[in-house]
Protein backbone atom coordinates (compact mmCIF):
# COMPACT_ATOMS: atom_id res chain seq x y z
CA UNK A 1 0.00 0.00 0.00
CA UNK A 2 0.98 3.61 -0.57
CA UNK A 3 0.80 6.13 2.26
CA UNK A 4 0.26 9.61 0.79
CA UNK A 5 0.81 12.63 3.05
CA UNK A 6 -0.30 16.15 2.13
CA UNK A 7 0.81 18.82 4.61
CA UNK A 8 -1.01 22.12 4.34
CA UNK A 9 -0.64 25.23 6.45
CA UNK A 10 -3.62 24.28 8.63
CA UNK A 11 -4.04 20.51 8.36
CA UNK A 12 -2.04 17.47 7.31
CA UNK A 13 -3.90 14.74 5.43
CA UNK A 14 -2.85 11.09 5.38
CA UNK A 15 -4.31 8.52 2.97
CA UNK A 16 -3.81 4.86 2.10
CA UNK A 17 -3.97 3.72 -1.52
CA UNK A 18 -3.89 0.30 -3.10
CA UNK A 19 -3.15 0.99 -6.74
CA UNK A 20 -5.51 3.81 -7.70
CA UNK A 21 -8.04 2.97 -4.97
CA UNK A 22 -8.30 5.32 -2.01
CA UNK A 23 -8.80 3.05 1.00
CA UNK A 24 -8.83 5.45 3.95
CA UNK A 25 -7.99 9.03 4.86
CA UNK A 26 -7.28 10.90 8.08
CA UNK A 27 -6.58 14.51 9.06
CA UNK A 28 -4.55 16.13 11.84
CA UNK A 29 -3.69 19.75 12.63
CA UNK A 30 -0.38 20.82 11.12
CA UNK A 31 2.35 21.20 13.75
CA UNK A 32 5.96 21.29 12.58
CA UNK A 33 7.08 20.34 16.11
CA UNK A 34 5.22 17.01 16.04
CA UNK A 35 7.71 14.14 16.20
CA UNK A 36 7.80 10.97 14.13
CA UNK A 37 6.86 9.01 17.25
CA UNK A 38 3.80 11.19 17.87
CA UNK A 39 2.68 10.81 14.27
CA UNK A 40 2.99 7.04 14.54
CA UNK A 41 1.02 6.73 17.78
CA UNK A 42 -1.84 8.68 16.19
CA UNK A 43 -1.65 6.99 12.78
CA UNK A 44 -1.21 3.45 14.08
CA UNK A 45 -4.38 3.71 16.15
CA UNK A 46 -6.44 4.97 13.22
CA UNK A 47 -5.06 2.35 10.86
CA UNK A 48 -5.93 -0.42 13.31
CA UNK A 49 -9.46 0.92 13.79
CA UNK A 50 -10.04 0.60 10.04
CA UNK A 51 -8.37 -2.80 9.79
CA UNK A 52 -4.99 -1.87 8.29
CA UNK A 53 -1.52 -2.77 9.49
CA UNK A 54 1.52 -0.57 9.12
CA UNK A 55 3.43 -3.57 7.80
CA UNK A 56 1.28 -3.41 4.66
CA UNK A 57 2.66 0.03 3.75
CA UNK A 58 5.52 -0.35 1.27
CA UNK A 59 5.83 3.23 -0.02
CA UNK A 60 5.37 6.79 1.27
CA UNK A 61 5.04 10.00 -0.74
CA UNK A 62 4.89 13.47 0.81
CA UNK A 63 3.80 16.89 -0.39
CA UNK A 64 4.28 19.80 1.98
CA UNK A 65 4.01 23.57 1.96
CA UNK A 66 5.49 23.62 5.49
CA UNK A 67 9.20 22.82 4.98
CA UNK A 68 9.95 22.38 8.69
CA UNK A 69 7.42 19.54 8.93
CA UNK A 70 9.23 17.45 6.32
CA UNK A 71 12.10 16.01 8.37
CA UNK A 72 9.93 14.29 10.97
CA UNK A 73 7.66 12.85 8.28
CA UNK A 74 10.68 11.44 6.46
CA UNK A 75 11.80 9.98 9.78
CA UNK A 76 8.31 8.49 10.24
CA UNK A 77 8.60 6.72 6.88
CA UNK A 78 12.10 5.41 7.59
CA UNK A 79 11.65 4.41 11.25
CA UNK A 80 8.17 2.90 11.20
CA UNK A 81 7.56 1.84 7.61
CA UNK A 82 11.12 0.94 6.62
CA UNK A 83 11.12 3.04 3.45
CA UNK A 84 12.65 6.28 2.21
CA UNK A 85 9.81 8.71 1.55
CA UNK A 86 9.48 10.26 -1.88
CA UNK A 87 8.99 14.02 -1.75
CA UNK A 88 6.92 15.79 -4.40
CA UNK A 89 9.10 18.21 -6.34
CA UNK A 90 12.42 16.69 -5.27
CA UNK A 91 14.59 14.18 -7.07
CA UNK A 92 13.97 11.45 -8.05
CA UNK A 93 10.31 12.56 -8.28
CA UNK A 94 9.59 14.57 -11.43
CA UNK A 95 6.31 16.33 -12.04
CA UNK A 96 5.60 14.89 -15.46
CA UNK A 97 3.90 18.17 -16.39
CA UNK A 98 5.29 21.51 -17.56
CA UNK A 99 5.25 24.46 -15.16
CA UNK A 100 4.87 27.29 -17.68
CA UNK A 101 5.36 30.26 -15.37
CA UNK A 102 8.16 32.77 -14.85
CA UNK A 103 9.38 31.14 -11.63
CA UNK A 104 8.54 27.41 -11.82
CA UNK A 105 10.59 26.71 -8.70
CA UNK A 106 8.18 28.85 -6.66
CA UNK A 107 5.05 26.86 -7.57
CA UNK A 108 3.75 25.21 -4.41
CA UNK A 109 3.92 21.42 -4.36
CA UNK A 110 0.21 21.21 -3.61
CA UNK A 111 -0.67 23.26 -6.69
CA UNK A 112 1.49 21.13 -8.99
CA UNK A 113 0.05 17.94 -7.48
CA UNK A 114 -3.48 19.31 -7.99
CA UNK A 115 -2.63 19.95 -11.64
CA UNK A 116 -1.60 16.31 -12.04
CA UNK A 117 -4.84 15.10 -10.45
CA UNK A 118 -7.00 17.49 -12.47
CA UNK A 119 -5.38 16.27 -15.68
CA UNK A 120 -6.20 12.69 -14.68
CA UNK A 121 -9.92 13.44 -14.25
CA UNK A 122 -10.33 15.95 -17.11
CA UNK A 123 -7.68 15.21 -19.77
CA UNK A 124 -7.67 17.21 -22.97
CA UNK A 125 -9.59 20.17 -21.53
CA UNK A 126 -8.63 23.51 -20.04
CA UNK A 127 -9.21 23.42 -16.29
CA UNK A 128 -9.52 25.92 -13.47
CA UNK A 129 -8.64 24.33 -10.12
CA UNK A 130 -9.83 26.26 -7.07
CA UNK A 131 -8.34 25.10 -3.77
CA UNK A 132 -10.00 26.42 -0.62
CA UNK A 133 -7.53 26.26 2.25
CA UNK A 134 -5.58 28.67 4.43
CA UNK A 135 -5.16 30.57 1.18
CA UNK A 136 -7.49 30.16 -1.77
CA UNK A 137 -5.72 29.48 -5.06
CA UNK A 138 -7.14 29.48 -8.57
CA UNK A 139 -4.94 27.72 -11.12
CA UNK A 140 -5.22 27.37 -14.90
CA UNK A 141 -4.28 23.89 -16.12
CA UNK A 142 -3.93 23.38 -19.87
CA UNK A 143 -5.38 20.53 -21.95
CA UNK A 144 -2.02 18.75 -21.76
CA UNK A 145 -1.81 19.14 -17.97
CA UNK A 146 0.63 22.06 -18.02
CA UNK A 147 0.44 24.47 -15.11
CA UNK A 148 -0.16 27.90 -16.66
CA UNK A 149 -0.37 30.20 -13.65
CA UNK A 150 -3.06 31.45 -11.34
CA UNK A 151 -4.17 33.56 -8.39
CA UNK A 152 -3.51 33.51 -4.64
CA UNK A 153 -6.13 35.09 -2.35
CA UNK A 154 -6.67 35.05 1.42
CA UNK A 155 -8.66 32.02 2.55
CA UNK A 156 -12.17 32.47 3.89
CA UNK A 157 -11.14 31.61 7.47
CA UNK A 158 -8.15 33.94 7.21
CA UNK A 159 -10.46 36.74 6.06
CA UNK A 160 -12.75 36.17 9.04
CA UNK A 161 -9.84 35.99 11.49
CA UNK A 162 -8.39 39.25 10.15
CA UNK A 163 -11.76 40.97 10.60
CA UNK A 164 -12.07 39.81 14.22
CA UNK A 165 -8.46 40.66 15.01
CA UNK A 166 -8.74 44.19 13.67
CA UNK A 167 -12.14 45.09 15.18
CA UNK A 168 -12.06 44.75 18.97
CA UNK A 169 -15.83 44.55 19.55
CA UNK A 170 -16.59 41.93 16.92
CA UNK A 171 -17.16 38.41 18.31
CA UNK A 172 -15.38 35.31 17.13
CA UNK A 173 -17.72 33.18 15.01
CA UNK A 174 -17.40 29.98 12.99
CA UNK A 175 -17.69 30.22 9.23
CA UNK A 176 -20.63 28.35 7.72
CA UNK A 177 -23.14 28.78 4.94
CA UNK A 178 -25.83 31.26 6.09
CA UNK A 179 -29.20 29.73 6.94
CA UNK A 180 -30.98 31.89 4.35
CA UNK A 181 -30.16 33.74 1.16
CA UNK A 182 -30.90 37.09 2.81
CA UNK A 183 -28.01 39.54 2.67
CA UNK A 184 -29.44 41.80 5.38
CA UNK A 185 -28.45 40.58 8.82
CA UNK A 186 -30.28 41.55 12.02
CA UNK A 187 -27.53 40.63 14.50
CA UNK A 188 -23.82 41.37 14.57
CA UNK A 189 -23.02 37.68 14.11
CA UNK A 190 -25.34 37.25 11.12
CA UNK A 191 -24.01 40.42 9.50
CA UNK A 192 -20.44 39.17 9.86
CA UNK A 193 -21.36 35.77 8.43
CA UNK A 194 -23.19 37.33 5.49
CA UNK A 195 -20.33 39.69 4.77
CA UNK A 196 -17.65 37.02 4.83
CA UNK A 197 -19.60 34.20 3.13
CA UNK A 198 -21.45 36.11 0.41
CA UNK A 199 -18.54 38.47 -0.06
CA UNK A 200 -16.33 35.44 -0.65
CA UNK A 201 -18.81 33.92 -3.10
CA UNK A 202 -18.85 37.21 -5.01
CA UNK A 203 -15.04 37.26 -5.09
CA UNK A 204 -14.88 33.71 -6.47
CA UNK A 205 -17.59 34.49 -9.05
CA UNK A 206 -15.68 37.56 -10.15
CA UNK A 207 -12.31 35.84 -10.37
CA UNK A 208 -13.74 32.90 -12.32
CA UNK A 209 -15.40 35.31 -14.76
CA UNK A 210 -12.20 37.30 -15.24
CA UNK A 211 -10.09 34.18 -15.78
CA UNK A 212 -12.59 32.75 -18.28
CA UNK A 213 -12.62 36.05 -20.17
CA UNK A 214 -8.83 36.23 -20.31
CA UNK A 215 -8.33 32.58 -21.28
CA UNK A 216 -11.06 32.79 -23.91
CA UNK A 217 -11.84 29.07 -23.96
CA UNK A 218 -14.30 26.83 -22.10
CA UNK A 219 -13.00 25.82 -18.67
CA UNK A 220 -13.84 22.90 -16.41
CA UNK A 221 -13.95 24.36 -12.89
CA UNK A 222 -12.78 21.91 -10.22
CA UNK A 223 -13.02 22.79 -6.51
CA UNK A 224 -10.96 21.14 -3.79
CA UNK A 225 -9.45 21.88 -0.40
CA UNK A 226 -10.64 21.56 3.17
CA UNK A 227 -13.21 24.35 2.81
CA UNK A 228 -14.57 23.47 -0.65
CA UNK A 229 -17.68 21.82 0.81
CA UNK A 230 -18.57 25.14 2.47
CA UNK A 231 -19.54 26.35 -0.99
CA UNK A 232 -21.11 23.15 -2.33
CA UNK A 233 -24.57 24.73 -2.38
CA UNK A 234 -23.27 27.31 -4.86
CA UNK A 235 -23.52 24.76 -7.66
CA UNK A 236 -23.20 27.41 -10.37
CA UNK A 237 -19.58 28.04 -9.38
CA UNK A 238 -18.10 24.60 -10.06
CA UNK A 239 -18.39 21.74 -12.50
CA UNK A 240 -17.15 19.27 -9.90
CA UNK A 241 -15.95 19.17 -6.30
CA UNK A 242 -13.03 16.82 -5.61
CA UNK A 243 -12.22 16.89 -1.86
CA UNK A 244 -9.35 14.41 -2.28
CA UNK A 245 -7.77 16.00 -5.35
CA UNK A 246 -4.34 16.55 -3.76
CA UNK A 247 -4.17 13.07 -2.25
CA UNK A 248 -5.17 11.55 -5.59
CA UNK A 249 -2.55 13.70 -7.27
CA UNK A 250 0.11 12.23 -4.99
CA UNK A 251 -1.10 8.75 -5.91
CA UNK A 252 -0.85 9.57 -9.63
CA UNK A 253 2.58 11.15 -9.12
CA UNK A 254 3.83 8.03 -7.36
CA UNK A 255 2.33 5.66 -9.92
CA UNK A 256 3.74 7.55 -12.91
CA UNK A 257 7.16 7.43 -11.26
CA UNK A 258 6.91 3.69 -10.78
CA UNK A 259 6.21 3.23 -14.47
CA UNK A 260 9.54 4.88 -15.28
CA UNK A 261 11.60 2.53 -13.09
UniProtKB/Swiss-Prot annotation:
Entries under Pfam families matching the protein = Pan_kinase
For the keyword Chloroplast, the answer is no
Q: Which UniProt keywords apply?
A: ATP-binding, Coenzyme A biosynthesis, Cytoplasm, Kinase, Nucleotide-binding, Potassium, Transferase
Which pathway features in its UniProt record?
Cofactor biosynthesis; coenzyme A biosynthesis; CoA from (R)-pantothenate: step 1/5
Q: Which residues form the active site?
A: 110
Q: According to its UniProt record, where is this protein located? A: Cytoplasm
Quickly give the catalysed reaction: (R)-pantothenate + ATP = (R)-4'-phosphopantothenate + ADP + H(+)
Query: What's its EC?
Result: 2.7.1.33
A Gene Ontology term for the protein's cellular component:
cytoplasm
Q: Which GO terms describe its biological process?
A: coenzyme A biosynthetic process
Name what cofactor the protein needs. NH4(+); K(+)
Q: What does the cofactor field's note say?
A: A monovalent cation. Ammonium or potassium.
Q: What is its main location?
A: cytoplasm
Q: Name one GO molecular function term.
A: pantothenate kinase activity
* Residues reported in the UniProt entry to bind substrate: 108-111, 188
* Amino-acid positions noted as binding ATP in the UniProt annotation, renumbered to this chain: 6-13, 134
Job of this protein: Catalyzes the phosphorylation of pantothenate (Pan), the first step in CoA biosynthesis.
Q: How does it assemble?
A: Homodimer.
Family per record: Belongs to the type III pantothenate kinase family.
Kindly provide the name given to this protein in its UniProt entry. Answer: Type III pantothenate kinase
User: Source species, please?
Assistant: Sphingopyxis alaskensis (strain DSM 13593 / LMG 18877 / RB2256) (Sphingomonas alaskensis)
Gene (name only):
coaX
